[in-house]
Amino acid sequence: MIKEVYLIRHSKPLKVNNDKNMDSLQIQNEKQPLSIEGENIAREKLNIKELKDIDKLYSSSYVRAISTAKYIAENNNIEINVINDFGERKFGINSWDELPDNFGEKQFLDENYKTEFGESQKEVRERTFNALMNVLKNDDKKIAIVFHSTAMLFLLMTWCKVIPDKDKYNVIFNNNIVFYGKYFDYCKIFKLTFNDKNKLINIENIKHD
């Protein structure tokens, strides 16, 4: 049975001043809601034909992901199933000042690079891949998953070559460029098609109208 999985980045979050916030940086990140603009982006960009007749909807546990997923849930009259393992990469720091210089570049080039308490590229990829494989064990044919930009890129690197080009990068699957740019836009959608043995056979970059 062919299965279609739509990987969707969350919409635009709200920026707030956390100087007096006693929560850990990780909890602050997980609690970050969508901005008004983010709500409007999600409402518009997720109301497309590709995201109709979804059998099962998943989201990370982050507030901005669930808040994005609710538009797909409403359009399809289905519930949101929360899975923690679709969450974003964990930095493992207490303040942004602790993040090493050129952290993103170093982690991109070395799959095992991480802070002492954070996650490596490889760990994020394995975590999200295992979660996806568990989802594919079910009989649902059309699945939507809302999660996060870096986690999505690291997951795609399971099957794709990612080649830097100055400040942008190419994501290549089976010698076809499926993405070229600096980052995934808010509500970016990739359609992954799996065969009856849960082997990935195609990746499509879904364009918004």
Predicted regions mapped to residue ranges:
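Acidic, low-complexity terminal tails and accessory targeting/binding regions
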Residues: M1-K3, I48, I78, V82, ...
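Active-site-proximal alpha-helix that buttresses catalytic centers in soluble enzyme cores
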Residues: I2-K3, I8-I80
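Beta-strand elements within well-structured catalytic alpha/beta cores of enzymes
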Residues: E4-I8, Y58, K141-F147, A151
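Short, solvent-exposed loop/turn segments at secondary-structure junctions
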Residues: S11-L14, Y62-R64, G87-E88, S149-M152, ...
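Phosphate-handling substructures
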Residues: L14, Q28-P33, E74-F129, Y180-F184
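Generic structural signal for well-ordered alpha-helical scaffold segments
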Residues: R43-N47, F129-K137
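Glycine-rich phosphate-binding loop signature in dinucleotide/nucleotide-binding domains
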Residues: E50-D53, V135-K141
